[in-house]
A protein has these predicted regions:
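Active-site helix/loop module of the DD-peptidase/beta-lactamase fold
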Residues: 1-18, 61
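Catalytic loop of the DD-peptidase/beta-lactamase superfamily, centered on the K-T-G motif
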Residues: 27-455
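Glycine-/small-residue-rich beta-strand-loop submotif within the FAD-binding core of flavoenzymes
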Residues: 18-28
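Short, mixed-charge, low-aromatic patches
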Residues: 2-9, 24-25, 101-106
Length: 455
C-alpha cells in the first residue's frame, strides 16, 4: 500500500475538491479517521488491502485470524430474522450476500465515508477480485462497487447474481388479530411515529407525530401517512417501491423489519415499538420548540448540521423528547435512548454552568438559545473567552452585516432560527444581507476578536 497512512494534507498530493449542492467549493476536509479504525487511502490501495484477505494475496493476518475475519459471526438477534442480517461479521458491513452465495461465492463489503467523501470496498476472495470506489460528496459508492463487481464477474465468465424479475402486486388480505395488537408508537433513528391498522383497506399506516410548537401547516401534513403498507400473507407491501415488511415479535420488543433490502438481500429493522409512559417525567426545561446552540465546535467544523439543533416534544407521547434522536425522560436532567435497537443513538444530559442550563449529547455541549447576546446597529466586538467556547449572537432587525474575523476564525449565520445556514465565512464574502431573527455562530481560539458592523 503506497498511499495510505498519513493524510494528503501531510504528505502532499492531489485530492478531489468538495462542492456543496449550490456549487460552493470548501477547503480540504479536516477529519480524524484512525481513531475510528479507518484508513486515509486511495482506491488503488484499498484494492490492495482487499486482496490481503484473498488466498494467494499478500496476507497481513495469520491464517487463523483470516479465518475468523472472513466468517459470519451472527448475533442472537440475527436468528430471529426471517432472512439474512447485515453487520454479522467482524468489521464488515456484510460477510455474505445471498445473491452471490447461491453460486457458491462469498462477497464481503465495507462502506466508509466522511462528510466530504463516500467510499466503498467490496471483495470476492475466492477469485481475488476487489473493487473500491471513492466519490467526492455524498454519493452511492456502495451501488457503484456492486455494479462494477457484477461487470468484472461477467467479463471473467463467472456466474453473477440473477436479475430481479418484476412481481405482480399482491391482493390486499384481512389483517390477522395477532398483528392488530401491535398498533401503537414506534421509533427509528430519527423520530417517533404512530402505527395504525385500517381493517377496511387492509393496510398499515405510519404517521409522524406532531409537536405542539409546530405550525398548523406542519401539523396538517402529519395527518397524512408517511408509509402505507398493504397486508398479504403476513407481509406488508409498499406498492410504490416494491419493498416488503414484517413484524418481528420474538424479542423483548417488537420491530417492523424490511425484508430482503434491495442490493443486499438482507433484512433490516426499520422501526422499534415503544410503550407510552404511565407517569411521564419532564425535563427541567421546556424542550418543545427550543433551539440549542453548540459551545464546543472547532472553527474547522466542515458542515454545520450539528451547530444549531431544535428539540421537540410529542403532544401524543408525553415522557419522550426529540433531540438528535428520540429520548425517554428518566429524570429532570436525563433522557435515555429510546431506539435501543439502532446504532448511532445517544443519551442527553442537562446540567448548569455559570447558572445557565446546558445540554450534553455524545461529545457535543449546547446552551439554550437565550444565552445569545444581541447585535446592535453599528460596530460590535465579540471576543472568544479563555475556555475557547463558541459565542453566539442574535439579530433583532434585518440589515447589512460586515464581518472581520481572525485568520482561523469562523462565522456562520442561521436565518430566522432555521437550521439551514445562509452564510459561512469559509466560502462567502465578508458582507451579507441578514434577515431579522437570525443567529450568528462564532468560533476561534481563546482571545480571538471578531468585529461585526450592522447597518
Amino acid at each position: 500500500m503506497r498511499n495510505s497512512g498519513e493524510s494528503v494534507g501531510v504528505t502532499g498530493g492531489k485530492i478531489a475538491e468538495f462542492y456543496d449542492e449550490e456549487g460552493n467549493k470548501y477547503p480540504p476536509e479536516v477529519v480524524t479517521v484512525l481513531g475510528a479504525g479507518g484508513l486515509s487511502s486511495t482506491p488503488e490501495d484499498l484494492c490492495r488491502f482487499g486482496d490481503s484477505f484473498a488466498p494467494g494475496g499478500m496476507n497481513i493476518l495469520s491464517d487463523s485470524s483470516l479465518k475468523d475475519v472472513l466468517k459470519e459471526q451472527p448475533t442472537p438477534f440475527s436468528s430471529l430474522l426471517k432472512g439474512d442480517a447485515l453487520l454479522d461479521a467482524f468489521g464488515w458491513d456484510y460477510a455474505l450476500l445471498p445473491a452471490y452465495r447461491e453460486n457458491g461465492y462469498q462477497v464481503l463489503g465495507k462502506s466508509g465515508g466522511t462528510l466530504f467523501y463516500s467510499t466503498n470496498l467490496q471483495i470476492l476472495p475466492q477469485e481475488r477480485l476487489a473493487v473500491a470506489v471513492t466519490y467526492s460528496g455524498q454519493a452511492g459508492a456502495a451501488k457503484a462497487t456492486h455494479r462494477i463487481m457484477e461487470a468484472l464477474m461477467k467479463d471473467k465468465g463467472l456466474p453473477g447474481p440473477k436479475p430481479v424479475s418484476p412481481v405482480k402486486p399482491p391482493e390486499p388480505q384481512p389483517i390477522p388479530d395477532e398483528f392488530l395488537k401491535l398498533a401503537g408508537f414506534y421509533v427509528n433513528t430519527q423520530e417517533a411515529v404512530r402505527m395504525i391498522f385500517d381493517n377496511e383497506s387492509h393496510t398499515l399506516n405510519v404517521y409522524s407525530l406532531a409537536s405542539p410548537s409546530e405550525d398548523e401547516e406542519a401539523k396538517e401534513n402529519k395527518e397524512k401517512p408517511i408509509l402505507s403498507l398493504v397486508h398479504n400473507g403476513g407481509l406488508f407491501h409498499d406498492f410504490a417501491t416494491g419493498y416488503r415488511y414484517y413484524f418481528l415479535t420474538g424479542e423483548k420488543t417488537v420491530y417492523l423489519v424490511m425484508e430482503e433490502v434491495p442490493q443486499y438481500g438482507a433484512d433490516i429493522p426499520m422501526y422499534q415499538k415503544i410503550d407510552p409512559v404511565e407517569k411521564p417525567e419532564s425535563l427541567s426545561v421546556v424542550m418543545d420548540g427550543r433551539f440549542w446552540l453548540i459551545r464546543n465546535a472547532s472553527p474547522f467544523a466542515q458542515l454545520p448540521d450539528d451547530l444549531l439543533v431544535k428539540s421537540e416534544e410529542y403532544g401524543d407521547l408525553p415522557g419522550y423528547v426529540k433531540f438528535f434522536g428520540v429520548n425517554r425522560v428518566e429524570t429532570p436532567d436525563f433522557g435515555a435512548i429510546a431506539a435501543t435497537g439502532f446504532r448511532d443513538q445517544c443519551n442527553i444530559q442537562l446540567f448548569k454552568k455559570d447558572g445557565a442550563i446546558r445540554l450534553k449529547a455524545i461529545q457535543f455541549v449546547y446552551s439554550s438559545e437565550d444565552i445569545a447576546g444581541t447585535l446592535v446597529p453599528g460596530e460590535n466586538t465579540i471576543v472568544i473567552g479563555s475556555e475557547g467556547e463558541n459565542e453566539w449572537r442574535k439579530v433583532e432587525q434585518g440589515g447589512i452585516m460586515s464581518i472581520e474575523k481572525p485568520a482561523n476564525g469562523r462565522v456562520i449565520i442561521f436565518p430566522r432560527r432555521q437550521v439551514e445556514k445562509v452564510y459561512d465565512s469559509i466560502i462567502d464574502s465578508s458582507e451579507i444581507s441578514v434577515p431579522g431573527g437570525s443567529l450568528v455562530f462564532l468560533a476561534g481560539e481563546p482571545g480571538d476578536s471578531f468585529s461585526i458592523i450592522v447597518r
